[in-house]
């Protein structure tokens, strides 16, 4: 098992008049090698879970297990520091994580910070920059001279240079044009196919259907539904009640079903819809 949350509660500014409960009794598992989506509105607890997975936060109650490391309210930073190498966290606007004077130095910083030699760190940085589609001609440029999309790729390369087993993505395509979004999602798909565990926060149900093999639905700090996307999206009424909706093709087929068209199961992808027509 890759990750397990057991009865996790999290309270921001605990013990103060401003205390605010972000998570209430959340239990979930993320299997090694899976592609898991977390969905829910702003304030539902998704981003808090991501920071718990990476060890940036510790639970107020309950536990988070990442491989062999158990994180509880009493865990110290020195005991969970290694998790940040195993679990790479890409924030919503990842380009804000950039700070070095050149692209290559920025990507090499993380491995060096964990004791990798400069030579090996630079070699890894070159490999990861190539992987995310940054041309070698840009390696010695200031990252702040690049476009927003390029800066985001550099930031992601910096996370990948740490060689994480799990990649945690908080709305990674926010603000990108359709082409840039598609290219990044294709990259994450390839990383998953290579064996990496992916955890994705997104508000795009079509991306959940296309890429994820597991989805958890969060609402007001609680886990309210979970399972395979093909199962979760069958409950169109529930998904509309929580104001998240379903993939476009699923919504279309639900309207057809309401008018008498028969489906064994509502398709969640275009390919499934085509197969249902041919079947």
Swiss-Prot record:
InterPro entries the UniProt entry points to: AAA+_ATPase, ABC_transporter-like_ATP-bd, ABC_transporter-like_CS, ABC_transpr_CbiO/EcfA_su, ECF_ABC_transporter_ATP-bd, EcfA2, P-loop_NTPase
GO molecular function: ATP binding; ATP hydrolysis activity; ATPase-coupled transmembrane transporter activity
Family: Belongs to the ABC transporter superfamily. Energy-coupling factor EcfA family.
Name of the protein in its database record: Energy-coupling factor transporter ATP-binding protein EcfA2
Domain of life of the organism encoding this protein: Bacteria
A Pfam family assignment: ABC_tran
The encoding gene: ecfA2
Task performed by this protein: ATP-binding (A) component of a common energy-coupling factor (ECF) ABC-transporter complex. Unlike classic ABC transporters this ECF transporter provides the energy necessary to transport a number of different substrates.
EC number per UniProt: 7.-.-.-
PANTHER family noted in UniProt: ENERGY-COUPLING FACTOR TRANSPORTER ATP-BINDING PROTEIN ECFA2 (PTHR43553:SF27), HEAVY METAL TRANSPORTER (PTHR43553)
Transmembrane segment boundaries: none
Subunit relationships: Forms a stable energy-coupling factor (ECF) transporter complex composed of 2 membrane-embedded substrate-binding proteins (S component), 2 ATP-binding proteins (A component) and 2 transmembrane proteins (T component).
Amino-acid positions noted as binding ATP in the UniProt annotation, renumbered to this chain: 40-47
Residues covered by the ABC transporter domain: 3-245
Location within or outside the cell: Cell membrane
Taxonomic source organism: Streptococcus pneumoniae serotype 2 (strain D39 / NCTC 7466)
Membrane topology, record value: Peripheral membrane protein
Enzyme class: translocase
UniProt KW keywords: ATP-binding, Cell membrane, Membrane, Nucleotide-binding, Translocase, Transport
């Amino acid at each position: 098992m890759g990750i397990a949350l057991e009865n996790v509660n999290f309270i921001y500014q605990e013990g103060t008049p401003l205390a605010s409960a972000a998570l209430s009794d959340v239990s979930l598992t993320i299997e090694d090698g899976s592609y898991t989506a977390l969905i829910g509105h702003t304030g539902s607890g998704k981003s808090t879970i991501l920071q718990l997975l990476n060890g940036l936060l510790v639970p107020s109650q309950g536990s988070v297990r990442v491989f062999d490391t158990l994180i509880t309210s009493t865990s110290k930073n020195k005991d969970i520091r290694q998790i940040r190498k195993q679990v790479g966290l890409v924030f919503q606007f990842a380009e804000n994580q950039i700070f070095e004077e050149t692209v290559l130095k920025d990507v090499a910083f993380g491995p060096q910070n964990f004791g990798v030699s400069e030579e090996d760190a630079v070699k890894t940085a070159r490999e990861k920059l190539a992987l995310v589609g940054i041309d070698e001609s840009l390696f010695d440029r200031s990252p702040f001279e690049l476009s927003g999309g390029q800066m985001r790729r550099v930031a992601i390369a910096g996370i990948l240079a740490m060689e994480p087993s799990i990649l945690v993505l908080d709305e990674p395509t926010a603000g990108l044009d359709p082409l840039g979004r598609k290219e990044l999602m294709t990259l994450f798909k390839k990383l998953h196919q290579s064996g990496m565990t992916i955890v994705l926060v997104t508000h795009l149900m079509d991306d959940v259907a296309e890429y994820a093999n597991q989805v958890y639905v969060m609402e007001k700090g609680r886990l309210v539904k979970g399972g395979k996307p093909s199962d979760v999206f069958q409950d169109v009424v529930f998904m509309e009640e929580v104001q998240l909706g379903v993939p476009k093709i699923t919504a279309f087929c639900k309207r057809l079903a309401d008018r008498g068209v028969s489906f064994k199961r509502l398709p969640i992808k275009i390919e499934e819809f085509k197969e249902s027509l041919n079947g």
